[in-house]
Amino acid sequence: MDHRIALKPNTPLCLSNDSGEMIHCIIKNEIGRGGSCIVYEAVRITDTGDQTLYRIKEFYPYKLHISRNNNELVPSVHDMDSFQKGQKQFRCDFSHTNRLFYSGDNYSSMTNQLDVFNQNGTSYILSAYSSENTLAAYKPVNLKECITLIKQVVYVLGNIHKMG
């Protein structure tokens, strides 16, 4: 059973990157979980009052003992070192994925990651919103679609592994 506690809908996030740039957004809902993260749909209200939609990936590893205290993630003393190493890897993965996205190949199935932020004792990756269904929700209608999807995933994973 997954013991992680997701951010609640309407939770405000004020994210700042290493350059001091800030973005204010509001969590709309959780859309997925992986072994190292929880993914949310979020919204930012522009100066004109329009909504800009984002995907936010929160570094929150499943296997570690981490509590959430007022939206702050607090790893146990025993897991602090593993958490910090994982967080560093999370940030490196952002850079690898960004290089892959802009490598000139067409990765229509990849999200455009915009920036990485540290906040609430963890890291967040901000991505451009995609109106496409998530991979978990995608239901191929036939074997040909399944094979096409698998080939795309294998191709991207192969390139990720080549990058280290």
Over which residues does each language-model region extend?
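Short beta-strand micro-motifs within the conserved protein kinase catalytic domain, predominantly
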Residues: Y102-S123
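AlphaC helix of the protein kinase catalytic domain
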Residues: T134-L143
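Conserved short submotifs of the Hanks-type protein kinase catalytic core
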Residues: Q119-T134
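ATP-binding glycine-rich loop module of kinase domains
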Residues: V43-S95
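Activation segment signature within eukaryotic-like protein kinase domains
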Residues: L149-I150
